[in-house]
């Protein structure tokens, strides 16, 4: 599986490290706070994504590790930029 993370705070950072340490394929991170995504990508040996859409395309499982108050906004962004994206990419979403 290819795991991607939208959000690179404590939860995304830690979960990505756990997966990477257990030989799982962490493809990378996207965050509105670039520095956090860059740091998380370095820490997990993965990639920093400047573009959320590219991370979606490269992932099979997408962890949404953003604050609860941001989920609706994030969902609307994903829907508007990726028509039929769940079927096209066979993608699973998980919010933690």
Functional labels for PLM-detected ranges:
Residues 24-28, 59-62, 87-89:
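Short active-site oxyanion
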Residues 94-96:
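Conserved small/polar residues in nucleotide/adenosyl-binding loops
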Residues 80-86:
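Short, conserved loop/helix-junction motifs that constitute active-site signature segments
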Residues 53-79:
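Rossmann-like NAD(P)-binding element
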Residues 1-50, 54-56:
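NAD(P)+-binding Rossmann beta1-loop-alpha1 motif at the extreme N-terminus of oxidoreductases
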Residues 30, 49, 63, 91-92:
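Hydrophobic/aromatic beta-strand patches that form the interior of the parallel beta-sheet core
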């Amino acid at each position: 599986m290819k795991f991607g993370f939208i959000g690179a705070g404590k939860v995304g950072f830690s979960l990505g490290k756990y997966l990477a340490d257990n030989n799982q394929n962490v493809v990378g991170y996207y965050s509105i706070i670039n520095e956090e995504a860059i740091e998380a990508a370095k820490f997990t040996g993965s990639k920093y994504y400047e573009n959320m859409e590219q991370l979606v395309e490269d992932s099979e499982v997408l962890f949404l590790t953003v604050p609860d108050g941001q989920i609706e906004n994030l969902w609307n962004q994903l829907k508007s930029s990726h028509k039929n994206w769940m079927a096209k990419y066979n993608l699973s979403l998980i919010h933690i």
